[in-house]
């Protein structure tokens, strides 16, 4: 088979690398619209869609109310990839505006203060990926040398998870009751 210009061989019983097959046997579909928003800072909310503890990966929905205060200034310990689905937001440290339909990549080590002055508020869907449980290091002021307010971690997303949140735990156990679950792993062996 040719895929993206490369010849690949797919055979029944083939092995999967990275040990992922040992941890991920279930594919899940979550209807984000049915999950409750959880306020994490004044006027700012998250929904935990999927939490994958072995890889410190979180899929989320994020919302800021119209007129909400700035989200806390923070360092990214993680990579964040986000797609704006409603309104717009910006960073106090810059001049650009991230509009509805735009994709954002926020690199580890980046420091910024997100805000939204959109009359309808702002929403996004995204993924945090980290090399540790820590995702964000929140600061008291929009200054990277200011006092650390706290950490935002994978555990925080486990704490706000809805019953529908798909969770893969460190031991490979899968919990949550997403809208649909599938096991498409038959015929694939882990390496």
What are these regions (language model features)?
Residues 1-83, 88-191:
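Jelly-roll (double-stranded beta-helix
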């Amino acid at each position: 088979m040719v895929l993206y210009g490369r010849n690949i061989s797919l055979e029944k019983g083939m092995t999967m690398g990275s040990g992922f097959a040992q941890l991920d046997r279930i594919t899940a579909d979550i209807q984000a619209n049915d999950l409750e928003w959880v306020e994490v800072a004044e006027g700012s909310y998250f929904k935990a869609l999927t939490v994958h503890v072995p890889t410190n990966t979180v899929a989320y929905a994020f919302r800021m109310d119209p007129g909400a205060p700035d989200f806390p200034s923070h360092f990214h310990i993680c990579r964040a990839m986000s797609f704006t689905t409603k309104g717009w937001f910006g960073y106090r440290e810059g001049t650009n505006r991230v509009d509805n339909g735009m994709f954002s990549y926020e690199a580890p080590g980046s420091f910024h203060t997100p805000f939204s002055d959109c009359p309808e508020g702002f929403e996004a869907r995204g993924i945090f990926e980290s090399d540790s449980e820590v995702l964000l290091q929140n600061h008291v002021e929009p200054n990277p040398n200011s006092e650390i307010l706290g950490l935002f971690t994978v555990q925080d997303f486990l704490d706000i998870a809805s019953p529908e949140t798909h969770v893969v735990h460190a031991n490979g156990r899968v919990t949550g009751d997403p809208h649909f679950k599938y096991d498409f792993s038959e015929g694939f062996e882990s390496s």
